[in-house]
Regions:
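Non-ligating segments of multi-cofactor redox enzymes
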Residues: 1-261
Length: 261
């Protein structure tokens, strides 16, 4: 099955939050009471039941102020730190290249929360589970667009085969010129959500400049964990071999002492 990519062209985003509402509706997520912090951004951040958020950012430009809108959510990394650290296998790759959570086996350890370079997974104390966007996996399996892409009225969110979406992104950057750039296809193995940004990535809030899998995750998952499993396997294998060759260990006979007796 061909890998899929969601392309977000922020130059076309008007901040209408249609995608945010569509995500809530499709995933049957209730709204939460929030406080006004002097911004149109609401809620203030991603939550365990808010998987898509339009970030509102005011940027000074010469003698005026302009808005930057950015849809935030899971980037669905090819080399996903969350999948690497998940001890239960709850976080896994799908046939579309995206990352989903099997909540029936999630143990609420929050390792993925700490490991994610994009600060995406959110923990719910009530259910003791972690939640994030799954790119509408149930819709993809039914050959439907993700709810956010379906709802976007300006064409800022599009969805399709990976190669076609990346090609479209670079064509759009060439059309925009200036500081426009493609964000997402060059790190963590390539993400399955990519942006066309109007400004340098450093300008955008809550968007890491050069995200990567934490070194501690690499050391544990790719080096220490296999070695520990190998060592543990060696102990088990040695014990089994001893059992086969010598049988079970018998208790000492009465009167048989140990040491120098």
């Amino acid at each position: 099955m061909a890998e899929k990519v969601k392309l977000i062209d922020v130059s076309k985003c008007t901040g209408c939050r249609g995608c945010q509402l569509a995500c809530k509706q499709w995933n049957q997520q209730k709204a939460m009471q929030t406080e006004n912090y002097g911004t149109y951004q609401n809620p203030p951040d991603l939550q365990y039941n808010t998987w898509t958020l339009i970030r509102f950012q005011e940027v000074a430009e010469k003698d005026k102020v302009k808005w930057l809108f950015r849809k935030d959510g899971c980037m669905h990394c090819t080399n996903a730190a969350c999948v690497k650290v998940c001890p239960s296998g709850a976080l896994h790759y799908t046939d579309f290249g995206t990352v989903a959570i099997n909540h029936s086996v999630c143990i609420g350890c929050k390792e993925c929360v700490s490991a994610c370079p994009f600060n995406i997974p959110r923990y719910d104390r009530v259910t003791d589970k972690v939640y994030k966007c799954d790119l509408c996996l149930s819709r993809l399996e039914a050959d439907l667009l993700p709810a956010c892409a379906k709802a976007c009225p300006t064409g800022a969110i599009t969805f399709g085969d990976k190669a076609a979406m990346i090609k479209k992104a670079y064509a759009r950057v060439k059309e925009l010129g200036g500081d426009a750039n493609v964000y997402g296809d060059k790190f963590v193995g390539g993400t399955h959500v990519i942006y066309v940004l109007q400004e340098h990535p450093k300008v955008y809030q809550e968007l890491p400049y050069k995200p990567s899998v934490p070194f501690s995750v690499i050391v544990w998952k790719d080096i220490l964990k296999p070695l520990s499993l190998l060592a543990a396997g060696g102990v088990v294998a040695g014990s089994f071999l001893h059992y086969i060759l010598h049988g079970p260990k018998l208790p000492d006979e009465p009167g048989q002492g140990k040491g120098g007796e």
